[in-house]
């Protein structure tokens, strides 16, 4: 049986050798060039392949059509991936008749994603393992072929556990590969309800929070001990790294971060003390704890701290245009909850952000993006990340005012994008699920789904094509002029402060707000074309968390990416949404203040939106990019979102209005 292998690291070397020992023919091996900035303590797949006389390649993008064609020419019967760091395209996965199989360093479906070796130690697990699974489009989600458990000892650190996993992987492969070679490939579906996802870890994630339980701090030390970057803290401006530690249950009543003693060196945590066995000051040598205390000038009672502001990076400045809008005000709240963000915002009103106006890290100017261009250009230049959130985004306005939609949604935003290009600033741009239009795919894929819109005489599509054209312009600026960008596509986000009942009164609101207005005023709920259109409703808290992670941009994984942000599990028709809303309304404590329910009324879209409207039957996102780039998964049920949104609007109605 002929195999093509994708491999890197020690696990890659083990996998290559196991495949050879099982009698497979290896047509080629694909690996990575070592990164000079990375501590390459591990074995070299390229050197192993060269020594074995096997062709080896390290392309920058193995999914490029040129490489896909070359792999196809190799005619592999089977494909293996052993710790190869990039996802393989479906085109590659489908080249091998027997399938493509990946070795993952956890007991799937737990700990999907990045760095499972480190995460299991961070989380204090007592067991992990290795899993060989069939590769599918979603990372680490395919059927399980075989797995092997590995016990985690209390004294295990990252390197010792790494060696255990390599041994377990070799045993697993030695056992299963001969069976697979004969065509007998077990397949057990993963239980999605048990799946957990973890993202890439960065060196800065090793910063110790002494207010955590001592077991948490000790587990962090274990998880990132050498040759990983290490857990670290500060004494004043002096950084030091802890390479090994042990737990002492008694903190003697000391405050977290306080030095209890220097010989041995013990530091108080939330519920105990950490004894530092070995460590390193700055870029110095590794020494035992008491010598480290001497080097740092520590004495009993000293307080360790987070990096001082003078020695750390300045706060990240985020410019939000349209800051008073639904996404803008919720995002502002999330950013201000983090110490290292400063928010600059502009909008034509401030009712939704009034709670932030006195915040020292929030800077607001009331203005119009079509008028205050000088202020905008200055602040694009001044800030680090730009979010142009201003848009007309309600369907009835697409048919009422198509030219205004184009002028604001495309022309004004294009000017802002050009400022970002001019000053080389990162832009996080709100595309929209509307760009998919009448796409017929079961779920909409950012990188593969076609964007399909209706005829020119249906102005309903002006919003979709304005956004799509900006997406394409931004992409081109990224390709040709190095613009750093991320496009995010929200799918029907809902929650408090979505818009207003007054907007619903003039027909310029989202669907749920219009439905709530009908309940508040005792008018029939209008179901456009019967309300059979399906959407995937997403809680604003889930959406904002994903957007926040895009801004954080861990490992620059979001650069140049398009990311759907929606909840595929919350798919419902507008009729089902209305029924759920009515049920929540009837159970609400304020129900008695409002008129009786006036029933449902089916209306044609033409009579409601005008002749220029055209609807979409379904709109369901693929969120593989969000899982992969953000380590994000939506978690809030649709009923919870509906109840919170309803509660917000009902409590916003004043007493006199309720009585009337």
Swiss-Prot record:
GO cellular component, one term: membrane
Gene Ontology biological-process entries: lipid A biosynthetic process; lipopolysaccharide biosynthetic process; response to antibiotic
Positions contributing to NAD(+) binding: 347, 368-369
Catalytic activity: UDP-alpha-D-glucuronate + NAD(+) = UDP-beta-L-threo-pentopyranos-4-ulose + CO2 + NADH; UDP-4-amino-4-deoxy-beta-L-arabinose + (6R)-10-formyltetrahydrofolate = UDP-4-deoxy-4-formamido-beta-L-arabinose + (6S)-5,6,7,8-tetrahydrofolate + H(+)
Site (Transition state stabilizer): 102
Site note Raises pKa of active site His, residues: 140
Chain residues that bind UDP-alpha-D-glucuronate: 393, 398, 432-433, 460, 492, 526-535, 613
EC number(s) on file: 2.1.2.13, 1.1.1.305
Pathway connected to this protein: Nucleotide-sugar biosynthesis; UDP-4-deoxy-4-formamido-beta-L-arabinose biosynthesis; UDP-4-deoxy-4-formamido-beta-L-arabinose from UDP-alpha-D-glucuronate: step 1/3; Nucleotide-sugar biosynthesis; UDP-4-deoxy-4-formamido-beta-L-arabinose biosynthesis; UDP-4-deoxy-4-formamido-beta-L-arabinose from UDP-alpha-D-glucuronate: step 3/3; Bacterial outer membrane biogenesis; lipopolysaccharide biosynthesis
Binding site for (6R)-10-formyltetrahydrofolate: 114, 136-140
GO function terms (MF aspect): carboxy-lyase activity; UDP-4-amino-4-deoxy-L-arabinose formyltransferase activity; UDP-glucuronate dehydrogenase activity
Residue ranges, annotated region (Formyltransferase ArnAFT): 1-304
Functional note: Bifunctional enzyme that catalyzes the oxidative decarboxylation of UDP-glucuronic acid (UDP-GlcUA) to UDP-4-keto-arabinose (UDP-Ara4O) and the addition of a formyl group to UDP-4-amino-4-deoxy-L-arabinose (UDP-L-Ara4N) to form UDP-L-4-formamido-arabinose (UDP-L-Ara4FN). The modified arabinose is attached to lipid A and is required for resistance to polymyxin and cationic antimicrobial peptides.
Name of this protein: Bifunctional polymyxin resistance protein ArnA
Originating species: Salmonella newport (strain SL254)
């Amino acid at each position: 049986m002929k195999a093509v292998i994708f491999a890197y690291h020690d696990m890659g070397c083990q996998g290559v050798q196991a495949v050879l020992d099982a009698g497979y023919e290896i047509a080629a091996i694909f690996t990575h060039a070592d990164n000079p900035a990375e501590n390459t303590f591990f074995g070299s797949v390229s050197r192993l392949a060269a020594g074995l006389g096997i062709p080896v390649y390290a392309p920058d993008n193995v999914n490029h059509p040129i490489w896909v064609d070359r792999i196809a020419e190799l005619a592999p019967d089977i494909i293996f991936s052993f710790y190869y760091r990039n996802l393989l395209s479906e085109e590659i996965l489908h080249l091998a008749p027997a399938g493509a199989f990946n070795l993952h360093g956890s007991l799937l479906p737990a700990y999907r994603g990045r760095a499972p070796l480190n995460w299991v130690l961070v989380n204090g697990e007592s067991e992990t393992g290795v899993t060989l699974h069939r590769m599918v489009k979603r990372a680490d989600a395919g059927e399980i072929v075989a797995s092997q458990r590995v016990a985690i000892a209390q004294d295990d650190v990252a390197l010792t556990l790494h060696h255990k996993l390599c041994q377990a992987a070799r045993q697993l492969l030695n056992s299963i590969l001969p069976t697979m070679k004969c065509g007998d490939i077990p397949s057990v579906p993963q239980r999605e309800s048990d799946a957990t996802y973890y993202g890439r870890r960065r060196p800065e994630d090793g910063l110790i929070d002494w207010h955590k339980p001592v077991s948490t701090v000790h587990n962090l030390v274990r998880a990132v001990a050498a040759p990983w970057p290490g857990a670290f803290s500060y004494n004043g401006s002096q950084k030091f790294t802890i390479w090994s530690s042990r737990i002492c249950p008694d903190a003697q009543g000391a405050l977290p971060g306080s030095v209890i003693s220097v010989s041995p060196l013990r530091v108080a945590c939330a519920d105990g003390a950490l004894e530092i066995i070995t460590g390193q000051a700055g870029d110095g040598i590794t020494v035992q704890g008491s010598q480290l205390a001497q080097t740092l000038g520590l004495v009993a009672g000293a307080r360790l701290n987070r990096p001082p502001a003078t020695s750390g990076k300045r706060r990240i400045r985020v410019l939000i245009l349209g800051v008073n809008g639904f996404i803008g005000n919720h995002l502002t709240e999330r950013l201000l909850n983090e110490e290292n963000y400063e928010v600059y915002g502009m909008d034509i009103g401030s009712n939704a952000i009034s709670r932030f106006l006195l915040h020292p890290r929030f800077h607001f100017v009331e203005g119009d993006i079509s008028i205050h261009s000088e202020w905008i250009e200055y602040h694009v230049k001044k800030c680090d990340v730009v979010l142009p959130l201003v848009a007309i985004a309600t369907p009835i306005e697409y048919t009422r005012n198509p030219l205004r939609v184009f002028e604001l949604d495309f022309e004004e935003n294009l000017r802002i994008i050009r400022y970002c290009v001019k000053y080389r600033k990162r832009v996080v741009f709100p595309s929209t699920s509307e760009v998919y239009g009448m796409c017929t795919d079961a779920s909409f894929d950012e990188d593969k789904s076609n964007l399909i819109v209706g005829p020119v005489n249906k102005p309903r599509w002006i919003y979709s094509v304005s956004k799509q054209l900006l997406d394409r312009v931004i992409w081109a600026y990224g390709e040709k002029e190095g613009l750093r960008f991320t496009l995010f596509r929200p799918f029907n986000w809902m929650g408090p402060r979505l818009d207003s009942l007054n907007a619903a009164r003039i027909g310029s609101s989202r669907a749920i707000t219009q439905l709530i207005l009908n309940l508040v005023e005792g008018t029939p709920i209008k179901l456009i074309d019967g309300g059979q259109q399906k959407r995937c409703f997403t809680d604003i808290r889930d959406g904002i968390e994903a957007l926040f992670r895009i801004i954080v941009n861990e490992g620059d994984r979001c650069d140049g990416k398009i990311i759907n942000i929606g909840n595929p599990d919350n798919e419902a028709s507008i009729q089902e949404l209305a029924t759920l809303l009515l049920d929540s309304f009837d159970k609400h404590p304020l129900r008695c203040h409002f008129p009786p329910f006036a029933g449902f009324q089916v209306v044609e879209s033409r009579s409601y939106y005008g002749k220029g409207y055209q609807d979409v039957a379904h709109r369901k996102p693929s969120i593989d990019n969000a899982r992969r780039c953000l380590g994000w998964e939506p978690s809030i049920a649709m009923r919870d979102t509906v109840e919170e949104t309803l509660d917000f609007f009902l409590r916003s109605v004043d007493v006199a209005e309720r009585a009337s």
